[in-house]
């Protein structure tokens, strides 16, 4: 009989934070453009090692309201926020990231920061 694999207890798991952002630009941007811009901003500002430690992960983007969610390691929230503020253009069009807020859960992030943009 096979044994069940052992799981990490919650105290040893890596903790994440979720950043809600709004993208303000000359034109509406697509999901793939935003995803690429976030990754490039992380790499150019934090470097390869810093990006590996921060573990930025694109969660969701609403093209209608131009708002989205990014997951990051809890120790590197401010570093990723800084990296996003340095973005000035995406594919040749002027754009800036506006951080709406940070939360420990997606549910709370949607309720507190993204509800006014129609997120449920």
UniProtKB/Swiss-Prot annotation:
Gene3D superfamilies named among the record's database cross-references: Ribonuclease P, Pop5 subunit
- Keyword Repeat assigned: no
Keyword terms: Cytoplasm, Endonuclease, Hydrolase, Nuclease, tRNA processing
Q: Name one Pfam family in it.
A: RNase_P_Rpp14
Cellular localisation: Cytoplasm
MF term (GO), any: ribonuclease P activity
EC numbers on record: 3.1.26.5
Top-level taxon? Archaea
Q: Subunit comment for this entry?
A: Consists of a catalytic RNA component and at least 4-5 protein subunits.
UniProt xrefs under NCBIfam families: PRK03717.1
**What is the protein name for this chain?**
Ribonuclease P protein component 2
Please give the organism.
Answer: Thermococcus gammatolerans (strain DSM 15229 / JCM 11827 / EJ3)
Lineage start: Archaea, Methanobacteriati, Methanobacteriota, Thermococci, Thermococcales
Q: Report which gene this protein is encoded by.
A: rnp2
């Amino acid at each position: 009989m096979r044994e069940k694999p052992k799981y990490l207890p919650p105290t040893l798991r890596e903790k994440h934070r979720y950043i809600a952002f709004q993208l303000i630009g000359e034109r509406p941007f697509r999901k793939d453009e935003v995803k690429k811009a976030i990754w490039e901003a992380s790499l150019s500002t934090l470097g390869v090692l810093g990006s590996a430690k921060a573990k930025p992960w694109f969660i969701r983007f609403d093209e209608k309201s131009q708002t989205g969610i990014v997951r990051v390691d809890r120790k590197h929230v401010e570093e990723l926020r800084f990296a996003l503020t340095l973005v000035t253009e995406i594919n040749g069009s002027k754009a800036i990231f506006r951080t709406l807020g940070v939360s420990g859960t997606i549910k709370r992030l949607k309720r507190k920061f993204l509800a006014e943009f129609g997120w449920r």
